[in-house]
Regions:
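Protein-protein interaction regions
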Residues: 1-83
Length: 83
């Protein structure tokens, strides 16, 4: 059986995993987990590098209101819904 690789974009730990167990540990119970399986390491790495989001906290001010976003996706969704 061919080895499979897993990319976790959102989870407890982001990265490329070479087994389902480690991937599952990163995503199990994580709200909004984002992961995908690949048949080869090269494809998995390209996907991960093409979807790198800045990490850390983002602060955005919209029309006199403020809100902290803990991930870039939430930030982008708020901006695209407002404008």
């Amino acid at each position: 059986m061919k080895k499979k690789f897993y990319v976790v974009l959102r989870g407890r730990q982001r990265g490329v995993f070479d087994n389902w167990g480690d991937c599952q540990d990163s995503i199990a119970g994580y709200k909004g987990a984002d992961y995908q399986g690949f048949c080869d390491l090269e494809s998995a790495t390209e996907y991960m590098e093409g979807n790198m989001y800045p990490s850390g906290r983002f602060l955005m001010v919209l029309r006199g209101r403020w809100k902290c976003y803990h991930n870039f996706d939430e930030f982008i969704n708020a901006v695209s819904n407002e404008y």
